[in-house]
Swiss-Prot record:
Recorded consequence of changing residue 28 to S: In allele DQB1*05:01 and allele DQB1*05:02
Effect of substituting residue 12 to D: In allele DQB1*05:01, allele DQB1*05:02, allele DQB1*06:02 and allele DQB1*06:12
Gene that encodes the chain: HLA-DQB1
Disulfide bonding pattern of the chain: 47-111, 149-205
Family of the protein in this entry: Belongs to the MHC class II family.
Cytoplasmic side: 252-261
Organism expressing this protein natively: Homo sapiens
Keyword check for Glycoprotein: yes
Protein known as: HLA class II histocompatibility antigen, DQ beta 1 chain
Domain Ig-like C1-type: 129-217
GO cellular component, one term: ER to Golgi transport vesicle membrane
Outcome, altering residue 119 to Y: In allele DQB1*05:01, allele DQB1*05:02, allele DQB1*05:03, allele DQB1*05:05, allele DQB1*06:04, allele DQB1*06:05, allele DQB1*06:07, allele DQB1*06:09, allele DQB1*06:12, allele DQB1*06:15, allele DQB1*06:17, allele DQB1*06:21, allele DQB1*06:22, allele DQB1*06:25, allele DQB1*06:34, allele DQB1*06:36, allele DQB1*06:38 and allele DQB1*06:39; requires 2 nucleotide substitutions
Region (Connecting peptide): 221-230
Phenotype for residue 118 to G: In allele DQB1*06:04, allele DQB1*06:05, allele DQB1*06:07, allele DQB1*06:09, allele DQB1*06:12, allele DQB1*06:15, allele DQB1*06:17, allele DQB1*06:21, allele DQB1*06:22, allele DQB1*06:25, allele DQB1*06:34, allele DQB1*06:36, allele DQB1*06:38 and allele DQB1*06:39
Effect listed in the UniProt record for changing residue 24 to I: In allele DQB1*05:01 and allele DQB1*05:02
Length: 261
């Protein structure tokens, strides 16, 4: 698995970077440029990790007015020009032994160092998702509908959501939202399935995530209107029974108090 991380550069390296920039801007080549009154100079450093620190790549990019003109890549271990603006600076930095050695060392002092810091917080953080299923509207059997599988409050972002109908995976009619950031280091996603439910159909939302030892599966069963009515009637009867039972207990309690007086 590959992982990319923007750098948290230690104070000493930040100072070295600023010194490098100032040195670059003070070189004869830089002085000879016809720079506009307002310009933007950017320095970006990125670490790329594959299978933890099994393979690490360090890339620094130098950008002038939103155009990258030179870079250092740890795979080649020297500065390279990207545009015609880059050769003078790349050649100058490569000629500075101290600059080149320090940049090469940052593969360990920055990338691997930061990886160990992040390992205890960001990289090992796990939050299990909550999964629910709901139809987009109440419809009778044999009518087109949309089932929505809501997968919420999970971290990290990698997740796999699949739909099954009667234990057979559904691949057509599946629509997903982009991954949504909640703003609290968790994510959510909605995965919809277009379907026409038949009596007895069982739809399953199957979710795989790094926080789970086993996938989460949530089922939704297609029911006829008569079955739904019977279920609602049963629930209604149960609630009414509880109400009458409560009233009976209250009346009995009050009558017992009256006899005692």
């Amino acid at each position: 698995m590959s992982w990319k991380k923007a750098l948290r550069i230690p104070g000493g390296l930040r100072a070295a970077t600023v010194t490098l920039m100032l040195a670059m801007l003070s070189t004869p080549v830089a002085e000879g440029r016809d720079s506009p009154e307002d310009f933007v100079y950017q320095f970006k450093a990125m670490c790329y990790f594959t299978n933890g620190t099994e393979r690490v790549r360090y890339v620094t990019r130098y950008i002038y007015n939103r155009e990258e003109y030179a870079r250092f890549d740890s795979d080649v271990e020297v500065y390279r020009a990207v545009t015609p603006l880059g050769p003078p600076d790349a050649e100058y930095w490569n000629s500075q032994k101290e600059v080149l050695e320090r940049t090469r060392a940052e593969l360990d002092t920055v990338c691997r160092h930061n990886y160990q810091l992040e390992l205890r917080t960001t990289l090992q953080r796990r939050v299990e998702p909550t999964v629910t299923i709901s139809p987009s509207r109440t419809e009778a059997l044999n009518h087109h509908n949309l089932l929505v599988c809501s997968v919420t409050d999970f971290y990290p972002a990698q997740i796999k959501v699949r739909w099954f109908r009667n234990d057979q995976e559904e691949t057509t009619g599946v629509v997903s939202t982009p991954l949504i950031r909640n703003g609290d280091w968790t994510f959510q996603i909605l995965v919809m399935l277009e379907m026409t439910p038949q009596h007895g159909d069982v739809y399953t939302c199957h979710v795989e995530h790094p926080s789970l030892q086993n996938p989460i599966t949530v089922e939704w069963r297609a029911q006829s209107e008569s079955a739904q009515s019977k279920m609602l009637s049963g629930i209604g009867g149960f609630v009414l029974g509880l109400i009458f039972l409560g009233l009976g207990l209250i009346i009995h309690h009050r009558s017992q108090k009256g006899l005692l007086h």
